[in-house]
């Protein structure tokens, strides 16, 4: 009887402990979402109300003035389309070059494999420099063209290493069976290896897309035509233009109003620039987890 009572008390303690752990895990999971929630809500709120009372879910305190100001600029849509084209084009080219380079390097019988790997690793530590890269892009006639954003950084050694590790993790018996069936190297690569490499290809695509989407420095250097500017560069210009100027220092009311609009525009641009990545990530989630785990098995 005593043992039964003790077991019941022990079970209750275990159940209570499990509930506490679950609540803790849920809170830790939701914690990273707080900054995102703050930015989204702040983009709809008057900065004066936000500073004085904090985040409010009362519709009376909300405003869409920041989004109206941003979308009233016709360059936003043009920059959004440009960023999509640059990001998709860059990501697709990066994935193709990475897997085409990684697969041969995953084969131990490749002549000069070690020296090629050393050469690639050296480029991770020593870059060509900004000025030589600019001169090369200029000599190739890519200045003020989309190719200046896509081509110079299309080869990423880290992506090649991830893809190589993934190919090394695939069973060698697949290749041996294909050779017995009469398949040549190209058939093995395109009909067997590429379909099996979908997880790592999606991971590399996501990495490249996010990196290019958030980039504005290359466009700032190589692009002078406003019609070719990506979204990040357009938003950067809008933020700079929305800041109070030196001529407003004497006009306190005008400066305060400009500061209020600048804060609204800042939060709105963060939401606009982050939205495509947030929408795209759930569709890549299953490939992302699988590709990362498989790509980390071998080096």
For each predicted feature, which ranges?
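A hydrophobic, multi-pass inner-membrane permease signature
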Residues: 2-299
């Amino acid at each position: 009887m005593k043992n039964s009572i003790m077991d019941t008390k022990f079970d209750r303690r275990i159940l209570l402990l499990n509930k506490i752990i679950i609540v803790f895990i849920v809170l830790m999971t939701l914690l990273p979402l707080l900054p995102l929630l703050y930015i989204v809500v702040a983009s709809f709120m008057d900065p004066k109300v936000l500073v004085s009372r904090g985040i409010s879910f009362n519709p009376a305190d909300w405003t869409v003035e920041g989004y109206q100001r941003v979308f009233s600029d016709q360059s936003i849509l043009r920059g959004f389309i440009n960023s999509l084209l640059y990001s998709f084009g860059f990501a697709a080219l990066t994935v193709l070059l990475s897997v085409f380079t990684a697969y041969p390097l995953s084969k131990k019988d490749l002549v000069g494999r070690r020296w090629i790997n050393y050469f690639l690793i050296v480029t991770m530590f020593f870059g060509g420099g900004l000025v030589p890269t600019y001169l090369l892009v200029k000599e190739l006639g890519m200045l003020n063209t989309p190719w200046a954003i896509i081509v110079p950084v299309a080869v990423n050694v880290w992506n090649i290493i991830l893809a190589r590790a993934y190919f090394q993790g695939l069973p060698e018996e697949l290749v041996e069976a294909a050779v017995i069936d009469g398949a040549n190297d190209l058939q093995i690569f395109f009909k067997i290896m590429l379909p099996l490499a979908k997880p790592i290809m999606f991971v590399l695509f996501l990495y490249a897309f996010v990196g290019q989407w958030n980039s504005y420095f290359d466009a700032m250097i190589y692009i002078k035509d406003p019609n070719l500017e990506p979204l990040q560069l357009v938003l950067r210009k809008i933020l700079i233009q929305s800041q109070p100027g030196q001529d407003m220092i004497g006009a306190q009311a005008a400066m305060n109003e400009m500061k209020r609009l600048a804060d609204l525009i800042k939060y709105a641009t963060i939401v606009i620039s982050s939205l495509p990545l947030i929408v795209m990530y759930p569709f890549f989630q299953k490939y992302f987890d699988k590709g990362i785990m498989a790509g980390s098995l071998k080096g």
